[in-house]
Amino acid sequence: MVKVGVNGFGRIGRLVTRAAVLSGKVQVVAINDPFIDLNYMVYMFKYDSTHGHFKGTVKAENGKLVINGHAITIFQERDPSNIKWADAGAEYVVESTGVFTTMEKAGAHLKGGAKRVIISAPSADAPMFVMGVNHEKYDKSLKIVSNASCTTNCLAPLAKVIHDNFGIVEGLMTTVHAITATQKTVDGPSGKLWRDGRGAAQNIIPASTGAAKAVGKVIPELNGKLTGMAFRVPTPNVSVVDLTCRLEKPAKYDDIKRVVKAAADGPLKGILGYTEDQVVSCDFNGDSHSSTFDAGAGIALNDHFVKLVSWYDNEFGYSNRVVDLMVHMASKE
């Protein structure tokens, strides 16, 4: 079983750790976070406002974080090149600070003895992999990879199924996206666009996202054919993608439902879901799929122009894919 280090014990760091423990597919052996001490880690891992109590045991013992009886080494280094991952037995490192997202910055982990680094965010220059879409293109010469974004993980499997069956001429994506940690609780200054700094609980905030363009990196045939934007809305978790696209081959909406369901039951099982129920966002809190197609929410204008809707738990679904990507990479060693 691959031994994993986690850098940054924020939303994704903690949920990747939960996903690792729950799945039993990888073993977390080390965590680095300079801003959270050991006892605080115990508390933050145990209690979660969005995903509830951790259903297991967690405690601090002999300077280590012990989850379900497994001791995890704790580091508190600000500089990733100083983290002694090898000493803790960590072979793969999940880079989940959101700060070290380039090849050069994430590469600092290799100095501490990590063999591979998985960036849990989009990267400007690291190769991006989306499970179920292009993970087969991974080869073991790559030391640093990106698991792309939660939104790309939702959109890409759906876009792949539609493109493989009907051909996407062009498309626009909108993600109606839950609040994330970078937003403000009340109006404040923003480092990027001014409106990004407006109160998250009070507003629907138009925002940029590279998620749709990134699909062109994981599905090269769609490069330049998709772009998109986001609305940040006052919900704590679970987001939804609206893909509006023009199809090359004519298709009835029932044809689209059929091929998506076939993919969800077959090659993309566990990654792409399918539902005909009258669901709302809360119904996907804690869902481990990358994307769940909402058959009842989509609409067709005609046989060539459709709006498709797919839900995702932007925290937990994504964290499960980080684990799956590491398992896949380990199978190629």
UniProtKB/Swiss-Prot annotation:
InterPro entries per UniProt: GlycerAld/Erythrose_P_DH, GlycerAld_3-P_DH_AS, GlycerAld_3-P_DH_cat, GlycerAld_3-P_DH_NAD(P)-bd, Glyceraldehyde-3-P_DH_1, NAD(P)-bd_dom_sf
Residues engaged in binding NAD(+): R11, I12, D33, R78, S120, N314
Modified residues (S-nitrosocysteine): C150
A Gene Ontology term for the protein's cellular component: nucleus
Pathway: Carbohydrate degradation; glycolysis; pyruvate from D-glyceraldehyde 3-phosphate: step 1/5
PTM entry text: S-nitrosylation of Cys-150 leads to translocation to the nucleus.
A Pfam short name: Gp_dh_N
Enzymatic reactions: D-glyceraldehyde 3-phosphate + phosphate + NAD(+) = (2R)-3-phospho-glyceroyl phosphate + NADH + H(+); S-nitroso-L-cysteinyl-[GAPDH] + L-cysteinyl-[protein] = L-cysteinyl-[GAPDH] + S-nitroso-L-cysteinyl-[protein]
UniProt keyword annotations, A-Z: Apoptosis, Cytoplasm, Cytoskeleton, Glycolysis, NAD, Nucleus, Oxidoreductase, S-nitrosylation, Transferase
EC number of this enzyme: 1.2.1.12, 2.6.99.-
GO molecular function: aspartic-type endopeptidase inhibitor activity; disordered domain specific binding; glyceraldehyde-3-phosphate dehydrogenase (NAD+) (phosphorylating) activity; identical protein binding; microtubule binding; NAD binding; NADP binding; peptidyl-cysteine S-nitrosylase activity
A GO BP annotation: positive regulation of type I interferon production
Site features described as Activates thiol group during catalysis, chain residue numbers: H177
Location of this chain's protein in the cell: Cytoplasm, Cytosol; Cytoplasm, Cytoskeleton; Nucleus
Active site residues according to the UniProt entry: C150
Chain residues that bind D-glyceraldehyde 3-phosphate: S149, C150, T151, T180, T209, G210, R232
Family classification: Belongs to the glyceraldehyde-3-phosphate dehydrogenase family.
Assembly notes: Homotetramer.
Summary of the function given for this chain in its UniProt record: Has both glyceraldehyde-3-phosphate dehydrogenase and nitrosylase activities, thereby playing a role in glycolysis and nuclear functions, respectively. Glyceraldehyde-3-phosphate dehydrogenase is a key enzyme in glycolysis that catalyzes the first step of the pathway by converting D-glyceraldehyde 3-phosphate (G3P) into 3-phospho-D-glyceroyl phosphate. Participates in nuclear events including transcription, RNA transport, DNA replication and apoptosis.
Protein name: Glyceraldehyde-3-phosphate dehydrogenase
Species this chain originates from: Gallus gallus (Chicken)
